[in-house]
Amino acid sequence: MDTSRPEALDSEPGVYKGMTQRQLDWAYDQANHAANRVQVLEQIAHKSALSRQLLPEPLRLSYGREPIEMLDWYVSEKAHSPLVFFVHGGAWKSGTAQNNALQAHWLHQMGCHVVIPDFDAVSDVDGNLSHLARQVQNALLYTYQTCAKHGANPQKIIVVGHSSGAHLSACMVTRDWRGLGLQEHPISALLCCSGMYELEPVSLSARSQYVRFTPEMVQDLSPQRGTEHFKMPVALLCGDQESPEFIRQFQEFSESLKLKHPRVTSHWVQGVNHFEILETLFEPDSIHARALKALMEDSI
């Protein structure tokens, strides 16, 4: 299969930043930018299983009424310790908490709690991406409210996300929390890896075949449009073998945040694609892991 960038035909109009529809669809389809994606995803699931084998069974807790609204909580024995809340990716339509625990072993060894929520696939909720954002928000609220019960420090919640999970993680900063009883989000630090932060181009791409984008959703769920809210330490990561659109999104979000907030770092990871960069999180000395450790120290 030819995965190279389609050449624009004279008859094709530009859809976004000079890209034709075919070029935009190509840019937002990870199959075109990571030929080894199936193998790497299998490795991520395998390493998650290895990580879980090194740990006590997590608590399986309900944060909502729906059967999918459950989370895995790897409890630390260290009192009043930090908590890492990880939001998995999967183009908003795949992924599980169980298969995204590859970082849990070394975080647990450091004395951290690790929480990984499950939530709906957008294709199972009529393309309603706002529903997923509400689920992740409810999972984070539940985690915050029960920190003391499980020995975690509610003032040290570090939210981490990859791909579409990075998008949802960043949305947690810009969402309204007042209706949930909080004046603002409970996030002490944020790490976003290989995410999307402006939904306009995504809404024009083939992803609109399974996400029911509306102008209101694009406005509400585009963290790029709410950079004034990112006052906590933030780390952004991107692999240099990513899709050009994911690279552009990383660069523009980084630049926008750095103009307003001094506690923002950005990290290029050499030689890795969209999926390989997540796999590196298994190793506690990887750039990905070191960025997370630095965030945890900076958020004190």
Protein language model features and the residues they cover:
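N-terminal cap/lid segment of alpha/beta-hydrolase-fold proteins
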Residues: Q23-A79
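Short beta-strand element of the alpha/beta-hydrolase
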Residues: S81-G90
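Alpha/beta-hydrolase
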Residues: V87, C193, V269-V272
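Alpha/beta-hydrolase active-site loop signature
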Residues: A91, F119-S123, Y197, N273
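Catalytic nucleophile-loop/oxyanion-hole region of alpha/beta-hydrolase
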Residues: G95-A104, V115-K156, E283
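Primarily recognizes the serine-hydrolase "nucleophile elbow" in alpha/beta-hydrolase
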Residues: L141-S205
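The feature captures the conserved acid-bearing segment of alpha/beta-hydrolase catalytic domains
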Residues: Q183-E184, A189-S203, P215-E252
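C-terminal catalytic histidine-bearing segment of alpha/beta-hydrolase fold enzymes
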Residues: I247, Q251, K258-I300
